[in-house]
């Protein structure tokens, strides 16, 4: 897909077609679990553009819960999400060329111990699987 940034609106737009000002985006995702219309995803950015995950997921019909800009505000309100259900739980450094003063990070991975919305997701998932 392609992403075009609108600076004045502080928003990006996704399209299947390239334009003069667009940049290609690549986003890889894996569904970890799902419940009704909600999914817990592991998302990997293959390109790193402004708002890429948020806008790309909304473009394919799966906006982030709690995202007031690209998501569904009625849904956010219904579930009480004031913040995006988006978390960088893992950061992996794989430099393909010399990274200078950051080279000591090459090959290292850092993982967050807990993601704030996962317990809430699984509470809803258990009620989902019992119905």
Positions of PLM-derived features:
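Glycine- and acidic-residue-rich catalytic/RNA-contacting loop of pseudouridine synthases
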Residues: 1-39, 95-101, 112, 120-121
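Short loop/turn positions at the edges of beta-strands in beta-sheet-rich folds
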Residues: 35, 45-47
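SH3/SH3-like beta-barrel fold
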Residues: 41-43
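Pseudouridine synthases involved in rRNA/tRNA modification
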Residues: 46, 56-131
């Amino acid at each position: 897909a392609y992403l075009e940034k609108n600076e004045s609106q502080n928003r990006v737009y996704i399209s299947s077609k390239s334009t003069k000002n667009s940049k290609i985006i690549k986003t890889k995702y894996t569904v970890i679990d799902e419940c009704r219309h909600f999914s817990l995803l592991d998302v990997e950015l293959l390109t790193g553009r402004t708002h890429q995950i948020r806008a790309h997921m909304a473009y394919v019909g799966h906006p982030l819960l709690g995202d007031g800009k690209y998501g569904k505000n009625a849904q956010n309100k219904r579930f009480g999400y004031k913040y995006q259900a988006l978390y960088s739980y893992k950061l992996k450094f794989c430099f393909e060329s010399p990274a200078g003063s950051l080279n000591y990070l090459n090959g290292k991975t850092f993982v967050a111990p807990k993601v704030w919305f996962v317990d809430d997701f699984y509470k809803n998932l258990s009620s989902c699987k019992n119905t």
